[in-house]
Structure formats: C-alpha cells, structure tokens
Amino acid sequence: DPNLKYGGTDIAVIGPPSRDKFLRLNFQSSRGTVSLGLKRENLYVVAYLAMDNANVNRAYYFGTEITSAELTTLLPEATVANQKALEYTEDYQSIEKNAKITEGDKTRKELGLGINLLSTLMDAVNKKARVVKNEARFLLIAIQMTAEAARFRYIQNLVTKNFPNKFNSEDKVIQFQVNWSKISKAIYGDAKNGVFNKDYDFGFGKVRQVKDLQMGLLMYLGTTPNNAADRYRAEL
C-alpha cells in the first residue's frame, strides 16, 4: 500500500486485509507452467498447481491455509477431484523434513538458491508422477525465491548477482527469513525517520539504521502506530 509509511521509511508495506485473500504466480519452464498460490496478507505460499504424468492439472494445498472452495477459485484448472491436501504443514521445518535433506545441517540452506535451481525443481514436479521429496524441495526454493525475495532486498540482490546460476545460501538469509515479523514490528513500533530508538540484533549483528536491513516489504500492522506501536515496542 503506497499510503503506508512505517518508521519514517519508504519501504513498501503489504496492504490491509481485503476480500481478495489470495494471489497467483505463474512460472514458465521447459516443461510448461507451474503456478503458486499465496496469501495476500503475508505472502505465505498456500498451494501449487502442476500437471501429473498423465497431463492432468492437479492442485496441492495446505489445508490450514486455504479451503477447497477457495482453491477452486484460485486455481480453477484443477477440479475438486484433482485437489489434494498436503500431508505436511506450511512451516519450513515440516517442509524440510519431507524434503529429506541429508547434507550439512539438513535445512533448506543446504539446497542453495537461484533461478536455474528453481527451474530444475519446477521440472521435477511438472508433468511427472508426484514424488513428495521433489515437491517439498520445490516448495522450499519457490517460497524463498518469491515471498522471501519480495520481503528482503538482501535476498533479491543475491539472486540478481548470481543470475541465473545456483548459489550457496547462508546463515544470514535464514535469519532474515525467520525474523520478518519481528523486523516489521521493530520498524513500525520503534523507528523514526529510518532510525531505531535502540540497537537491534536479528541474528546477524547489531543494527541501528533501518536501511542497513535492506528490506523490500513489511507486514501490515495497521495504519497509524500510536497505541499499536507502543504494544509492538513492548513485545520487542
């Protein structure tokens, strides 16, 4: 919402809740189109659409985040009979467990990031029989390359710098991802003219200038800080 300015900055802010709860992103690869469904209010990925090995459109979704009826509206190519609620939840830990990552610390960091990697994993889930490990790995990379890249210019810049190649992720990327809500609340409730009232440490060193966080998008926390800002300041 261009009218929302948090902490005296020009960082974009997600608009207030509306009747349009979801948005759709379409990706093209050598095997065709794969679509993602995201929640507008926080950019959480709630579903994806791909063809199976019989070229039938199928939609897979997190049942706690979107209903079958909402999914039909968002991804109408898949009939209700061809919708499937995923057996795991939308949090990173659950997806990582199903991705069966055996390297290093066994988290998404070990997979890396990059456009070529995203394209490879799209091809692994499109026009093929469903394999949960491939699906979970696709979701891990797709979430980071869409929602997380929108939230953090730091991640955007890494993608651009290495485009289109795969690159190794890093601890700082993970710390950004798990602290989006906390960072948004700190900027909303405890920053003025782009400067925090105290030093903050979000897992990668102390920060006083908001610009040093290289944010791309903040979560919606209200239109006017006032009492709400006091509440968020107290939480931090």
Swiss-Prot record:
<protein>
    <recommendedName>
        <fullName>Ribosome-inactivating protein saporin-3</fullName>
        <ecNumber>3.2.2.22</ecNumber>
    </recommendedName>
</protein>
<dbReference type="InterPro" id="IPR016139">
    <property type="entry name" value="Ribosome_inactivat_prot_sub2"/>
</dbReference>
<keyword id="KW-0611">Plant defense</keyword>
<comment type="function">
    <text>Ribosome-inactivating protein of type 1, inhibits protein synthesis in animal cells. Useful as immunotoxin for pharmacological applications.</text>
</comment>
<dbReference type="InterPro" id="IPR017989">
    <property type="entry name" value="Ribosome_inactivat_1/2"/>
</dbReference>
<dbReference type="GO" id="GO:0090729">
    <property type="term" value="F:toxin activity"/>
</dbReference>
<dbReference type="Pfam" id="PF00161">
    <property type="entry name" value="RIP"/>
</dbReference>
<comment type="similarity">
    <text>Belongs to the ribosome-inactivating protein family. Type 1 RIP subfamily.</text>
</comment>
<dbReference type="InterPro" id="IPR001574">
    <property type="entry name" value="Ribosome_inactivat_prot"/>
</dbReference>
<feature type="active site">
    <location>
        <position position="148"/>
    </location>
</feature>
<keyword id="KW-0378">Hydrolase</keyword>
<dbReference type="GO" id="GO:0017148">
    <property type="term" value="P:negative regulation of translation"/>
</dbReference>
<dbReference type="GO" id="GO:0006952">
    <property type="term" value="P:defense response"/>
</dbReference>
<keyword id="KW-0652">Protein synthesis inhibitor</keyword>
<dbReference type="InterPro" id="IPR016138">
    <property type="entry name" value="Ribosome_inactivat_prot_sub1"/>
</dbReference>
<dbReference type="InterPro" id="IPR036041">
    <property type="entry name" value="Ribosome-inact_prot_sf"/>
</dbReference>
<dbReference type="InterPro" id="IPR017988">
    <property type="entry name" value="Ribosome_inactivat_prot_CS"/>
</dbReference>
<keyword id="KW-0800">Toxin</keyword>
<dbReference type="GO" id="GO:0030598">
    <property type="term" value="F:rRNA N-glycosylase activity"/>
</dbReference>
